[in-house]
From Swiss-Prot:
Belongs to the complex I 20 kDa subunit family. It is found in: Cell inner membrane. It catalyses: a quinone + NADH + 5 H(+)(in) = a quinol + NAD(+) + 4 H(+)(out). GO terms for molecular function: 4 iron, 4 sulfur cluster binding; iron ion binding; NADH dehydrogenase (ubiquinone) activity; NADH:ubiquinone reductase (non-electrogenic) activity; quinone binding. The gene is nuoB. This is NADH-quinone oxidoreductase subunit B. The lineage of its organism: Bacteria, Pseudomonadati, Pseudomonadota, Alphaproteobacteria, Rhodobacterales. PANTHER family: NADH DEHYDROGENASE, NADH DEHYDROGENASE [UBIQUINONE] IRON-SULFUR PROTEIN 7, MITOCHONDRIAL. It is a peripheral membrane protein. One of its GO terms (biological process) is electron transport coupled proton transport. Its cofactor is [4Fe-4S] cluster.
Length: 175
């Protein structure tokens, strides 16, 4: 029988596991509020597009019936205030950088960013141009990089699955 939950570290985990086993037989589930919030956050990513060039076409294709991104619990949103994931796809210019930062700042916490394509990752083909930002990670913090020029819809889908896996594993990402 369990003695109490006032123990620390590994002893507390063992006590919690023992209590969970006892309650499972009676139809109860023991978990933490943080685990429930992370489970809900992982299964309901609301993303907004920041399509700047040809990668945006592949990003749109991911929402079509062949790939159907919504079956993974993600849904597109038009407003940054309703989304927690921003997908930056395409060439980011110096004139567009302040707009990207402004949209990012309007998103509620926790917020995630996927950089899609060579241009968003590091400037791509236009890397040496005077008007191109050499990677959107210079403007906003990026969680997942999707390589390619342009990356396929499968690559973006894999990037979103990796982000969900990362959220599930670590909870809220620490920056």
């Amino acid at each position: 029988m369990m003695t109490g939950l006032n123990t620390a570290g590994a002893d507390r985990d063992l006590a919690t596991a023992e209590l969970n086993r006892e309650l499972q037989d009676k139809g109860f589930l023991l978990t933490t509020t943080e685990d429930i919030i992370n489970w809900a956050r992982n299964g309901s990513l609301h993303w907004m597009t920041f399509g700047l060039a040809c990668c945006a076409v592949e990003m749109m294709q991911t929402s079509m019936p062949r790939y159907d991104l919504e079956r993974f619990g993600t849904a597109p949103r038009a407003s940054p205030r309703q989304s927690d994931l921003m997908i930056v796809a395409g060439t980011l210019t110096n004139k567009m950088a302040p707009a990207l930062r402004k949209v990012y700042d309007q998103m509620p916490e926790p917020r995630y960013v996927i950089s899609m394509g060579s241009c968003a990752n590091g400037g791509g083909y236009y890397h040496y141009s005077y008007s191109v930002v050499r990677g959107c990670d210079r403007i906003v913090p990026v969680d997942i990089y999707v390589p390619g020029c342009p990356p396929t819809a499968e690559a973006l889908l894999y990037g979103i699955l990796q982000l969900q896996r990362r959220i599930r594993r670590t909870g809220t990402l620490v920056r």
